């Protein structure tokens, strides 16, 4: 919520400045990047100062080099997940690669799509994303409702199916003739879906993390969320360079969500996923 709220405030600021001073798209982009640079520098400094000092949880084995030990540890963790957590965690991390790639690219490609296909100005694109960010709030409430009626696995898959459907709708229906109101409605629906997608994803992960591996798997979580983030934009770029309509490119990148849904569908039923994690926790507690 803090992340989406900060993005919304920044968008409102830039829309106000652009409209107030009558800037064109180039000037708006220049000013926004300048503000970004200042804000990021301040946030980095503040975060660095406030970051607590924590003792190392592992020591470097004799004869091992720090440069390579991290890779060795990651490989060992990956093998442990494959061996001990086949029912849920393995499928979650695999699905995460494609799910995050889809969600991240959706917002990136939307800028190109709105400009090239819809003919939106920079201010209109800002309004589009402001609407999307506002709608993440009811999306989060909807996520809580759906997840309470089902489970995180089912809820997360449903959010990705809806996201894919929105991609297909936008790619096939939206154009200059449909007008901006329909595009804004589409943006609102995308915002609701992303507001449903992200908290459900994090809830899913938090409920299946094995005891004692929280810090290490948090790194795995970030790694999996970024490892193929480059692929959907590349697919979109290849299609556009081949003179394929941008709408079909939007549909293509949305298809990565279906891969994530298929992977999650291979996981065990939700009670078995939880039992798999709880069983490992109980074993570790007994050994302690």
Please report, for each region that a protein language model flagged, where it lies by residue.
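Intracellular loop-helix junctions on the cytosolic face of multi-pass helical membrane proteins
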Residues: 1-97, 101-105, 259-288
């Amino acid at each position: 919520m803090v992340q989406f709220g900060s993005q919304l405030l920044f968008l409102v600021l830039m829309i106000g400045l652009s409209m107030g001073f009558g800037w064109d798209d180039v000037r708006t982009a220049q000013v926004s990047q300048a503000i970004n640079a200042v804000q990021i520098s301040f946030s980095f400094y503040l975060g660095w100062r406030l970051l607590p000092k924590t003792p190392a949880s592992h020591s470097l084995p004799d004869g091992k080099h720090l440069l390579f030990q991290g890779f060795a540890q990651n490989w060992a963790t990956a093998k442990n997940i494959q061996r001990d957590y086949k029912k849920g965690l393995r499928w979650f991390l695999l699905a995460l690669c494609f799910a995050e790639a889809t969600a991240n690219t959706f917002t990136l490609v939307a800028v190109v799509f709105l400009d090239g296909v819809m003919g939106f100005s920079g201010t209109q694109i800002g309004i589009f994303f402001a609407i999307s960010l506002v709608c993440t709030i009811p999306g989060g409430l909807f996520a809580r409702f759906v997840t309470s009626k089902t489970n995180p696995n089912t809820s997360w898959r449903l959010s990705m199916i809806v996201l894919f459907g929105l991609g297909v709708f936008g790619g096939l229906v939206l154009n200059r003739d449909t007008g901006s109101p329909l595009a804004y409605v589409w943006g609102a629906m995308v915002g609701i879906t992303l507001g449903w997608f992200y908290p459900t994803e994090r809830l899913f992960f938090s409920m299946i993390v094995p005891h004692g591996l929280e810090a290490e798997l948090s790194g795995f979580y970030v790694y999996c969320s970024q490892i193929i983030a480059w692929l959907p934009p590349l697919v979109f770029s290849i299609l556009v360079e081949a003179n394929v309509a941008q709408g079909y490119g939007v549909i293509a990148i949305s298809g990565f969500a279906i891969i994530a849904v298929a992977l999650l569908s291979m996981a065990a039923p939700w009670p078995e996923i939880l039992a798999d994690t709880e069983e490992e926790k109980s074993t570790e507690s007994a050994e302690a």
